Each structure stands twice: as C-alpha cells, then as structure tokens.
Amino acid sequence: MPISLGSKGSCQIGGNIATNAGGLNVIKFGSIRNNILGIEAILPNGEFYDDLKTVKKNNTGFDIKQLLIGSEGTLGIITAATFQIHKKTNDRVVIFLHSTHLMYC
C-alpha cells in the first residue's frame, strides 16, 4: 500500500479513508483519495452503498465515493474499500557534500 502513515500501529483503514489521510509518501503517491478505486458504505438513512466495481472511471451522476472520502463519518460509515497498488521501488538517492566552511553548505 503506498500510504505510509506515522501512526500505522494504531490507525485503521476506515478512519484513514474518512479523514483522507496523506501520510509520509503523499508527494509521491498522493493522498488516500487518489489511491481508492471503490468503496462500500452504510449511509445515514440505512441504505447500503456499493461502489466496489472493477470500472476505474465512471462519469455517470455524482461520485458518492469521493464525497465519502474525507467526510469524517458524517455522510456514512465505510465498511470496505478497494485500493490501487503501486509497484515497490528500491530507489535510493545519496548526496555527499564537502566544503571547507560550514556557511557555504
């Protein structure tokens, strides 16, 4: 999962989605909103909302999934989610800097 959270030992996926958590890799992979493909939730009126489809893009009507992400539980309780998985990279960048005076660094 591309989202790397500082509180990974104590947080839950549903709470991360409800608050649109960013995490430590937010610049590289985007927030959790950019990595969710589908959501299943219970709406406040008791209706069951299911958007766990395999279609990546759907432009028909309102995107309730995007409304639920970041709503902090006010628009519904998220019960399941489908995430986009990124390939793990092992890239490292190392920079060595040498100077005779600290003020030139």
Q: What does each model-identified segment do?
A:
Residues M1-C105:
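FAD-binding subdomain of flavoenzyme oxidoreductases
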